[in-house]
Amino acid sequence: MTVHFIGAGPGAADLITVRGRDLIGRCPVCLYAGSIVSPELLRYCPPGARIVDTAPMSLDEIEAEYVKAEAEGLDVARLHSGDLSVWSAVAEQIRRLEKHGIAYTMTPGVPSFAAAASALGRELTIPAVAQSLVLTRVSGRASPMPNSETLSAFGATGSTLAIHLAIHALQQVVEELTPLYGADCPVAIVVKASWPDERVVRGTLGDIAAKVAEEPIERTALIFVGPGLEASDFRESSLYDPAYQRRFRGRGE
């Protein structure tokens, strides 16, 4: 018996990986967070599968589901939104599984920041403008941020910031980053990336709070901050330079 942790992607059901889809189809038990994982993914479950919405459940209750499935010899598909590597809360589940000696696998998914960048129609790394992307958040109810991991510390690098789980703290974002990036620095907020009701709010650190106040956003939003978001007059990379192609890629005769 194995618990398969599966990154279910940012929202749209057709953005799940082929491996993730196939694993769902092979598992007689499926656990998913109904509050953030698309119910359309459940159509990949095999007939008669036991489907459990973990949204209202505690970690102890989820652990009990794993133990029950292990006793029955049933593989479990455990769906988490986005990708498992960041803010998935799988670490504490894995610790519980290891306590019981239950095997597990991890299958990556399309992360929310990638879907949000697609919604913007932008590459996030622009030659000579922005070559680093920081994925971060602010302190919240689920867990505090380490003292050294502040918006100000990351903003001091000048990198493009992808700030997750922070729409409730937009004013804090503006206040901490404006002295570092300037009031005219581009900001883009992507709400429910890849979902049918996806929307984008664009502005600057100087006016984004007022724009959001006109159309309030409650949750499931990602805030991008950085000059690369609007850069158009930038140098081209050497990737397609003929000399680069000859040396590193090879060229057909």
UniProtKB/Swiss-Prot annotation:
Report what the protein is called: Precorrin-4 C(11)-methyltransferase
Q: Gene3D superfamilies, per this entry?
A: Cobalt-precorrin-4 Transmethylase, Domain 1, Methyltransferase, Cobalt-precorrin-4 Transmethylase, Domain 2
Enzyme class, first EC level, given as a word: transferase
Give the matching PROSITE patterns: SUMT_1 (PS00839), SUMT_2 (PS00840)
What is the name of the gene encoding this protein? cobM
Query: What keywords is this UniProt entry annotated with?
Result: Cobalamin biosynthesis, Methyltransferase, S-adenosyl-L-methionine, Transferase
User: Record's PANTHER family?
Assistant: COBALT-PRECORRIN-4 C(11)-METHYLTRANSFERASE (PTHR45790:SF4), SIROHEME SYNTHASE-RELATED (PTHR45790)
| Species of origin | Sinorhizobium sp
Q: Which GO terms describe its molecular function?
A: precorrin-4 C11-methyltransferase activity
